[in-house]
Every structure is written in structure tokens, then in C-alpha cells.
Amino acid sequence: MPILSKLNKRVRARVEEDDFEHFSQESASDGSELGEEDEEETDDSDGSTSESDDGSGRDGDESENEDLESDSASDANSDITSSLNNISFGALAKAQASLGKRKRSTTLTADIASKRPKGPSRSPPAPSSKEDQKYPNATKPPQKLSHRTSKHAPTIQSSRHAVTRKRTVIENPAIPQARDPRFDSVVLNHSTNGNPSIATNATIHASKNYAFLNSYRTEELSQLRKRLQNLQREKSKDTHDEREIERLKRQITSMSDRMRTFERKEMEREVLAGHRRKEREAIREGKKSQPWFLKKGDVKREVVTRRFTEMSGKEKQRALERRRKKIASKEKKEMPWARRGVE
């Protein structure tokens, strides 16, 4: 077979061979062959025109010749396909090695160009924004994280945030908290032989156990007031005395407020205890099936009424005046600045 014999030949590529000359020679040889075929066709066509007047017999001969030519062409194609099927891979490798790099690159580029869709060539867009100029080689510029809707919303963090490589080997010790044994439920639980009612109401039982401290506080408060009165009577313009007077005033107000809060809490406990006692008696007598629990607002209202009934005339006036000033200052804070100066 001619193709196998050609492929099995040892072919050595020329080093200084120019591809352009090779292709030009091939094209020239192809052109000469095509020219000869064209001349033959023209001769045939001239002969056919001259013989067209002879009759229908010659037309039949021409059709038979065309059939013979088509049969010969099909036989040649079948021979080529059969020879190509029998080619070994070694022969194909040798043929590929014999071809130059330029020929292979040109054929590859021609194949790629033929496969590409025909249309207007699109050049890559020039970097217009700052992000494109900052990241020219990146496929997608980094997206900026959106801001939070409010300061209470959770913060947004990128998943590409690098994790810290520092590791806490020894954690900081916990900050020790001050624990007063007078108000500690653990201490009271051990001291009362494990009575759960005392452990839960530790502050109540601690206040009962240390009720004598209130008498000490009242005595100290009276001594501070006497000392303040003595300093104010002297009316000295010494800066040291003025500072001492201010310090005593602050200390007296803080102690009096603390005593007032203790009294209010004690009164709240008395109100709750009296209400629970009444509810238990009503359930025991059958007047009620379930107890009624007071709310915090009801307890506070009951405490205010008790304090107001126990006050004297002057104390009531002072309390009402303080209440009025408190409400007025609250309303003034809610008032706009334009109206505050008028009133």
C-alpha cells in the first residue's frame, strides 16, 4: 500500500528549511496539477461540444464513463480508509515527529480559529474603577462588606479573615470577689444546720441577726450632725474647715439615704408578711381556695401609704414638697430648650 510505505520511511526534518518555501512549492505543485486537470476538462468539454451533434448514443457513453470514474474514486477512498485503519501508532508517532514545530503550531491555531464563532472581536474592558486598577490580575474584585443597619446588629466579618496563631497556654486567674459572711447563703446554710428556708432568705435572717448595727448607725449619724453644727457656728473662712463641712454633708446624706432604704425594705417585708398571714387565715377558714399574691407595685403603694400615715405634719409637708420638686424637674427635663427659659 502506498501510504504505509511512505509512513514507514525514515524522514529527517531539515533544520534550515523555511516553512513558507515548503508551502509555496506544495501550492505550486498543486496548482500545476489543477491546471492540467482543468486543461483536460476543457479538452473534454470541447470534445463533448463537438460531438454533441452526433446523437444520443454518445451521451450514453459519457454516462457510463462517469459511472466508471465514480466507482474508481469510491474504490480509492476505500483503499485509503483501510490503509489508515491499519497504520500502527509507531508510524503515526514518526510522522508527527517528522513535522516541524511551526507546522503543528500553525495547524493548531488554524483549528482553534475555525472552531471560534465568527463575530465582532471583544477586547477585554479597560480597568475603569479604582478596584480594577488595584487588582488588575484578579478575576473578581473583593466585595466590600455592607455596613450594619444599627449598632445593636451583629458585626459582619469576612470568612477569609485569618485565624490568630496565638494560643492561650495559661489563662488569667479569675478576679476574686468580696464575700460578706453576714449575707452569704453558704455560711448561713452551715450555721443553721441546713435549714433551706433560712438559706433562701439569707438577707432577711442576716438583717435580723445584725439588727444591732442600726443602733450604731443612728448614733454615728447624730454625732456627725452635731459636729457639722459646731463647724457652721464658728463661721471660719479657713479652706480646711470648708472642705470638712462639705465632706460631712456628703457623709450625712449618704448615711441618711442608706438608713431610709433599710427602713423601706423592712417595711416592704412587713407588708408581705402581713399579707401572707391574712391569706393563710382566709384559706384555713375556707373563705379562699387559692392565695392571692401581691405585685411589686401594690407593695410599693402600701409602703408609701404607711409611711405617709406615720409622718407628722411638718414631715408630710416636706415629703410633699420633695415630691413636687421631683415631678417638676422630671417635666422640665422632658420640656424642649426653647420653653425652659420662658417658664
UniProtKB/Swiss-Prot annotation:
Residue ranges of region Disordered?
Answer: 1-82, 94-181, 310-343
Residue runs in coiled coils? 214-266
Q: Tell me if Ribonucleoprotein is a UniProt keyword of this record.
A: yes
Domain of life from the UniProt record: Eukaryota
Q: How does it assemble?
A: Associates with 90S and pre-40S pre-ribosomal particles.
GO cellular component labels: 90S preribosome; nucleolus
Keywords carried by this UniProt record: Coiled coil, Nucleus, Ribonucleoprotein, Ribosome biogenesis, rRNA processing
Provide the organism lineage as a comma list.
Answer: Eukaryota, Fungi, Dikarya, Ascomycota, Pezizomycotina
Look up keyword Coiled coil and say if it applies: yes
Looking at the Swiss-Prot or TrEMBL record, what is one Pfam family this protein matches?
RRP36
- What protein does this entry describe? rRNA biogenesis protein RRP36
